Amino acid sequence: MDLHTAVYNAAHDGKLPLLQKLLAGRGREELEELLGEVAGGGTPLLIAARRGHLDVVEYLVDHCGASVEASGSVHFDGETIEGAPPLWAASAAGHLAVVRSLLRRGASVNRTTRTNSTPLRAACFDGHLDVVRYLVGEHKADLEVANRHGHTCLMISCYKGHREIARYLLERGAQVNRRSAKGNTALHDCAESGSLEILQLLLGCHARMERDGYGMTPLLAASVTGHTNIVEYLIQEQPGHEQLSGTELPGEGSSQVAGNHCSTPEEAEPYESCCPTSREAAVEALELLGATYVDKKRDLLGALKHWRRAMELRHQGGGYLPKPEPQQLVLAYDYSREVTTPQELEALITDPDEMRMQALLIRERILGPSHPDTSYYIRYRGAVYADSGNFERCIRLWKYALDMQQNNLEPLSPMTASSFLSFAELFSYVLQDRSAKGNLGMQLGFADLMGVLSKGVREVERALQLPKEPGDSAQFTKAIAIILHLLYLLEKVECTPSQEHLKHQTVYRLLKCAPRGKNGFTPLHMAVDKETTNVGRYRVGVFPSLQVVKVLLDCGADPDSRDFDNNTPLHIAAQNNCPAIMDALIEAGAHMDATNAFKKTAYELLDSKLLAKSTVQPFNYVTLQCLAARALDRNKVPYKGFIPEELEAFIQLH
């Protein structure tokens, strides 16, 4: 173990005597090095603050000159926080004594992490009320600094259910109607977490029932997450709001602080008069809650109970609230339509499958196709069908969800990428199942695979049309890899000549986009790289793949294309020791003696321990023109401007 690691470990374990021994007599420069970041990204001071070792913290700052602002990486709840200062780590862990010590020694109370999280937010996250009071009350920590998502300290306190912290922040003037980057408010966070008491507290401070970026009210948010207590309160109860300062916190005065005037019991309005819920909103909330009971809670009887109440409200007082007529019935939903009468609703008791379709229909109508939950639960229902062996229903539902995602989400959305990967894994399983069972297995048709492959190419086209190209994006590389896996599977399915032509047209569309993955890899580079195999949890295709390479070459892939290190696909095939693929590339016109950025040919990259070299004879493919080009390059003969441009490009190839 080196000295730097030993110092870090001593600080981590709170072993002050050992730390003093290790650092005693060191010069300033050596101390700076030893107190810097270790390989994991943290500093000795940062980890000591994280672990609450007050004596170690004060020794490192007072005697060793450690900076109280030096940030690094620290781990909390399985997550790595980048750019965290020591005060943030101590606040997140609830070490009040360390927090006091660091602030006395000059730490900035509002210094943020890389994601713009403050020490106050860190304390709010895990419910450290004493730290929150100290940061705000003694050091005037800014309540309104939001993280990179626009999420404030009040919002995270509400989401985590820390009632007393939320109460304290409101008393200190936290903005109750502040909106995040996605448009949600603290009320949304209460609704999503089921914190009814905090929700009542916020309403007492005149919180407004706003819609977020998806058009969701807190009422709908509670329905989506299945918090019946919130839904019931918002649509039915009419209590006075909870007093903000019914029992004043020590050292605090009136409930009107920094502009927040929250209700006392005498002046509180009934809920229905200050934030009335319309009959239509209540109906939709109950219908959506029922859908949540079907898919999330798997409680069909509970769902029926909520749907009955919604139906009663629709018919209440003789003024029927009609459901909008669907523009067309959906094959994926088995052409189901929503029930509109109490009799139709009661008939669902005998048909659980129809109930599940009702849940999907209701969710799509109320949330709309752009809400993530809409496509998520369609995919979930498809997965349940697949688990029971009903692959056809699964494929229909997943295709419908994929169309919905591509029409409503941004290109390369993680949800869309997940859909493509799920398709690839399902198709791989079905083909293996068919191979094992023969005629008893499901017939996976060309149209199923081809349809998804075409949508995958469309996703790449959409991504490349964005103002900012995806470049070396890991998500973009994964999208290309999944397309190659789908092509790999498609090669296992028999095709008619017209289907073969359609397949080649689609691959040509992909190549025409000229997409580039990691390190500038073209699809042909990726097809000859073993890393392309690792695309998900389950194996789909195996790469390098000769079949995929041949299809790409047949459709016009350039065998001499270069990545960022000037490697051709031939170089990558050589690194992966694939002589058969190398032969195919050479037959397609790849230059055997083309060199990369390190002046290596593909032949020189072959593993000498394997027999691959004996099957590839470079001199069978090297021309006199190639030898002349290499001689010019090797001897540094000036040629630019003296020969035609085509010849210049040829020499540069070598």
Swiss-Prot record:
Q: What post-translational changes are documented for it?
A: Phosphorylated; highly phosphorylated in myoblasts and myotubes. Phosphorylation at Ser-108 and Ser-608 promote PGE2-EP4-mediated inhibition of inflammation. Dephosphorylated by protein phosphatase 2A (PP2A).
Q: Where in the cell is it found?
A: Mitochondrion; Cytoplasm
Q: What do we know about what induces or represses this protein's expression?
A: Up-regulated in ischemic hearts.
Q: Which domain of life is it from?
A: Eukaryota
Q: Where are the ANK repeats?
A: 2-31, 40-70, 82-111, 115-145, 149-178, 182-211, 214-243, 519-561, 565-594
Task: Supply one GO molecular-function term.
Answer: ubiquitin-like ligase-substrate adaptor activity
**Is Phosphoprotein among this UniProt entry's keywords?**
yes
Which Pfam families does the entry link to? Ank, Ank_2
Pathway where this protein functions: Protein modification; protein ubiquitination
Gene3D superfamilies associated with the record: Ankyrin repeat-containing domain (1.25.40.20), Tetratricopeptide repeat domain (1.25.40.10)
| UniProt note: phenotype after gene disruption | No visible phenotype in normal conditions: mice are fertile and develop normally without any apparent malformation. In mice model of chronic inflammation, mice develop more severe colitis induced by dextran sodium sulfate (DSS). Mice display less microglial accumulation; decreased microglial activation is observed in the brain after systemic lipopolysaccharide administration. Mice also show behavioral abnormalities, possibly caused by monoamine deficits. Mice display reduced anxiety-like behavior and brain inflammation in a model of Alzheimer disease.
UniProt TPR repeat ranges: 283-317, 375-408
Which stretches are tagged as biased composition: Polar residues? Answer: 253-263
Query: Which controlled-vocabulary keywords does the entry list?
Result: ANK repeat, Cytoplasm, Mitochondrion, Phosphoprotein, Repeat, TPR repeat, Ubl conjugation pathway
Record-linked InterPro entries: Ankyrin_rpt, Ankyrin_rpt-contain_sf, TPR-like_helical_dom_sf
Q: In which tissues is it expressed?
A: Preferentially expressed in cardiac muscle, brain and liver (at protein level). Also expressed in skeletal muscle.
Q: Which GO terms describe its cellular component?
A: Cul2-RING ubiquitin ligase complex; mitochondrion
Task: Enumerate the residue ranges of region (Disordered).
Answer: 242-265
Q: Tell me the residues on which Phosphoserine occurs.
A: S108, S608
Q: How does it assemble?
A: Component of a CRL2 E3 ubiquitin-protein ligase complex, also named ECS (Elongin BC-CUL2/5-SOCS-box protein) complex, composed of CUL2, Elongin BC (ELOB and ELOC), RBX1 and substrate-specific adapter FEM1A. Interacts with PTGER4. Interacts with NFKB1; the interaction is direct.
Function, please? Substrate-recognition component of a Cul2-RING (CRL2) E3 ubiquitin-protein ligase complex of the DesCEND (destruction via C-end degrons) pathway, which recognizes a C-degron located at the extreme C terminus of target proteins, leading to their ubiquitination and degradation. The C-degron recognized by the DesCEND pathway is usually a motif of less than ten residues and can be present in full-length proteins, truncated proteins or proteolytically cleaved forms.
The record's similarity note reads:
Belongs to the fem-1 family.
Q: What is this protein called?
A: Protein fem-1 homolog A-A
Q: Which organism is it from?
A: Mus musculus
Q: What is the lineage of its organism?
A: Eukaryota, Metazoa, Chordata, Craniata, Vertebrata
